[in-house]
Amino acid sequence: NKVKYWMTFNEINNQMNFINDIYGWTNSGAHFGDYDSPEEAMYICGHHTLVASAKAVKIGKEINPDFKIGNMISMVPIYPFSCRPADQVLAQQQMHDRFFFCDVQCRGHYPAYALKMFERNGFNIDITEEDKKVLAEGTVDYIGFSYYMSNTVDSNSIRDISMTTDGSSKHSVKNPFIHETAWGWAIDPEGLRYTLNMFYERYEKPLFIVEN
């Protein structure tokens, strides 16, 4: 009872880069490449992880109602490279990948954009009525997150990300207004302010910077 603040899964959303094997292993203990659809496999594993997180929150509250139990999200905010509408929409869509796990953990249900994406891609994610109940009853009290860099996307650019660990996407490009570290990570303190505002506007929950 001396420890009052808890988190369930560390950087649970890193596995959205299902192409890089390290994230399947570290987030869900799975090798998504073994499946016909690595992306579908990631969402299936992610669903069970979300249910487990919600159950942990509920059990923690039963142990001690004073516990504050949060999630832990790796947040790399996405900027559009230009004012081209295609870049704006791409950045918005890629932010869905950043928010997906947090949306479920904070709101207690799957967002409409995710359910529509499952339908369009023919993904079979077995979300039972019991799962829905568990998710609704096990929302987190606060948002824990890491912030190291921002990312910029260009709808006209495509690259290989199978070995990347910097939170980038296949559409990532260098931001001409931001300096980088020696290993290519954007040095963007304004991005942290942007992230804090974005999180609070979306969820209105307390925020905890866990890694920076």
Locate the predicted segments by residue:
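Active-site region of glycoside hydrolase catalytic domains
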Residues: N1-N212
